[in-house]
Curated annotation (Swiss-Prot):
Its EC number is 7.2.1.1. The gene is nqrA. NCBIfam families: nqrA, PRK05352.1-2. The keyword Transport applies. GO terms for biological process: sodium ion transport. HAMAP family: NqrA. Composed of six subunits; NqrA, NqrB, NqrC, NqrD, NqrE and NqrF. It comes from Pasteurella multocida (strain Pm70). NQR complex catalyzes the reduction of ubiquinone-1 to ubiquinol by two successive reactions, coupled with the transport of Na(+) ions from the cytoplasm to the periplasm. NqrA to NqrE are probably involved in the second step, the conversion of ubisemiquinone to ubiquinol. Pfam families: NQRA_2nd (PF24836), NQRA_N (PF05896), NQRA_SLBB (PF11973). GO terms for molecular function: oxidoreductase activity, acting on NAD(P)H, quinone or similar compound as acceptor. Belongs to the NqrA family. It catalyses: a ubiquinone + n Na(+)(in) + NADH + H(+) = a ubiquinol + n Na(+)(out) + NAD(+). This is Na(+)-translocating NADH-quinone reductase subunit A.
Amino acid sequence: MITIKKGLNLPISGSPEQVIRDGNAITEVALLGEEYVGMRPSMKVREGDVVKKGQVLFEDKKNPGVVFTAPASGTVTAIHRGAKRVLQSVVIKIEGNEQITFEKYTTEQLNQLTSEQVRQNLQASGLWTALRTRPFSKVPAVDATPVSIFVNAMDTNPLCADPQVIVQQSAQAFEAGLTVLSRLHEGKVYLCKAANASIPSPSIANLDVKEFAGPHPAGLSGTHIHFIDPVSATKFVWYINYQDVIAVGKLFTTGELDVSRVVSLAGPQVKNPRLVRTVLGANLSQLTANEVKDGENRVISGSVLSGAKAAGPVDYLGRYALQVSVLEEGREKEFLGWIMPGANKYSLSRTVLGHFSKKLFNFTTALNGGERAMVPIGAYERVMPLDIIPTLLLRDLAAGDTDSAQALGCLELDEEDLALCTFVCPGKNEYGPLLRQALDKIEKEG
């Protein structure tokens, strides 16, 4: 077992009840284009087209063969584009139950699958996009081969769902998915879970179960990869979350694309925080209807630390999101707030009374201060368990020095790995976008 000592479990109120219930009825779903790093779509549908579940909506021009399929049958009602014609979302109004079917196999046949059979089924169904590479966090090329594959069956994000509850509902499909992934390549498949967690796993020669313990980010794939099989500019691994593994298992055993999702609907502004069953790409305005408290709220697709604001053309559940978090918009300014004792405020440092409290806090979106230069007071080191020097790395990211940032380990990271550094930063700097700029530049320059 690998134990993480550095990190932070955010004391936020609104934790979900770990019981799965049906969410609100969803009549509209969407695929979000900006979730896929570096993707340039070649559209296969236009507004007004009627599509089946599993039908190709667009293909990646930069990565031929990687297709993105419809999560539901219905009519394409909108194709939203942003600045520079960047694809924001393809919206489908759900109608009917028509779907495209794919190859299916018996349990015995799963153990005899070839890598080519696995690739063909995953790519045809669009489930290939559930896999991501490290470094760069991109959907892998159709002919690429990883050194190893990481299955993340744990979660330490604030307000997260317990993977045990969800996996136990689909244990056979989860094991089938692990079997399929083990046939994808000859290297190791690492199943990463929390210490003593009841996560089923089949007896497969190249499956290795690893346990992690400690505060967040102990449950992030970046942490698992760093401690088990670190990457480099020439060494790539792939990773996938546990709910997508279940979807892979159902695809290969039933021949149908499974787009169901169990997400944590939680946060200080949620009336009844719990786990809800919904669909991939669900309209979050519909999912959160009558579920949130009065006031101006921000709905987040994903974690409060690293999720994306869901509004307008991107008001939908993300491809990789396992949470829907709701916070109050913190627009009110506090008179002389800097001099108050701050009993109802949380801080990692001993600057407010809330630091010494054991209670949970109603966090808002307020920054509690203005943006300024980096202040190296040791805050980053307290929440960074990886074997890197965070202050120097973050300085290089802010300065745009990609050579030094690469030497300090930025290739191992994704935006979510720096989310805690952003949270504790005295200068209120956003390090996720800076990391992405550096990674894009490194990849472009080779």
